[in-house]
Amino acid sequence: MLDMGDRKEVKMLPKSSFSINSLVPEAVQSDNHSGHSHHNSHHPHHHHHHHHHHPPPPQQPQRAAAAEEEDEEKAPLLLPPPAAGALEAAKAEALAGKGEAGAAAAELEEKEKAAEEKKGAAEGGKDGESGKEGEKKNGKYEKPPFSYNALIMMAIRQSPEKRLTLNGIYEFIMKNFPYYRENKQGWQNSIRHNLSLNKCFVKVPRHYDDPGKGNYWMLDPSSDDVFIGGTTGKLRRRSTTSRAKLAFKRGARLTSTGLTFMDRAGSLYWPMSPFLSLHHPRASSTLSYNGTASAYPSHPMPYSSVLTQNSLGNNHSFSTSNGLSVDRLVNGEIPYATHHLTAAALAASVPCGLSVPCSGTYSLNPCSVNLLAGQTSYFFPHVPHPSMTSQSSTSMTARAASSSTSPQAPSTLPCESLRPSLPSFTTGLSGGLSDYFTHQNQGSSSNPLIH
């Protein structure tokens, strides 16, 4: 019991120390010296007592084990990093031979030391792993060489409906380019800015029956010739020759569907009043302009209400493609009278193949660019025209026929003059015009006004 007390007093010393490695051998040596001195001093007096109660053989292996532990601990002290086996042996020896207070203090110090070592090892491992992961990221998730406009166009063109919402564009980019999935800062704002600023992208409002949020984004039809450059990754337009080929293909496509450039151009290339329609249900002809074949519809002439007649009907009304009739013109339902031709325009346009079919409608094939030169005039029904008299239909048709050879004497066919002699005019118009058209078609090649 005294032996345990002595050891307890000796083991209280390591509380003020900083390192357990330097104190463990000293503690073991002090234990050995105290054990030897205590045994030598008490053995002569209590030899039999120790012999019966504390036999020497159990103490000798204990001292031998302590010496072995001391040797094992001295060897690791020569190496810079402490071995884990030495720490565990020291911990076991301290717990076995020390008192509760000393053992608790030593155990706390060992735990702190082990925690620091584990933390350092963990940090070193993390640094190594993060370095490897960084290399993998740099090798695998490089920034794609495409501009934001190219990414947007790529996403919209590859969508099934050729339209996407803003979130749909984000999802496409993150799905196909892991770099943007890992780095989400900044590029989404850039996508929004490019959508708003680039004219290639058009915002389409969502239909009220379509569930969801956000508008759709589509590509402008004019961006068909825009492609993504292979080296730069930016949007580029095709060359002039490629555009010409693409325009030719578009023209053929539009001709097959009936959509033409002149349909959209409207009255910009045709001098008509805005309330008259440019579309004709029988538009099937083409115009060769400057040697280039371009689709061109057969436009109804607004003066057709005066020049054409429904030969099958007896109501003396002039059926036209745009729904105008002489009855409406005479009664003053339309504020503006229709266009009328001067002599030069009449001579230039009428022999171009005006046909009066049995149905009463007509199909006019414009063949001269002079028709686009604005050789028509406007007049109001209330303006008197003293040059015209309501004599008879034969005189009017004769005057129209004579005007084809004398462009300097223009004659007009005003709507106001048709009011008194409408029945006689409509009765004799078909016969006079048919003779006139036949004569003009035969001599159209010698007419100097046709170009």
UniProtKB/Swiss-Prot annotation:
One of its GO terms (molecular function) is DNA-binding transcription factor activity. May determine the nasotemporal axis of the retina, and consequently specify the topographical projection of the retinal ganglion-cell axons to the tectum by controlling expression of their target genes. Residues 142-233 bind DNA. CDD domains: FH_FOXG. It is found in: Nucleus. Residues 108-143 have a biased composition (Basic and acidic residues). This is Forkhead box protein G1. The lineage of its organism: Eukaryota, Metazoa, Chordata, Craniata, Vertebrata. Residues 29-80, 101-143, 389-417 are annotated as: Disordered. Retina and brain. Keywords: Developmental protein, DNA-binding, Nucleus, Proto-oncogene, Transcription, Transcription regulation. Residues 35-55 have a biased composition (Basic residues). Residues 389-412 have a biased composition (Low complexity). One of its GO terms (biological process) is negative regulation of transcription by RNA polymerase II. One of its GO terms (cellular component) is nucleus.
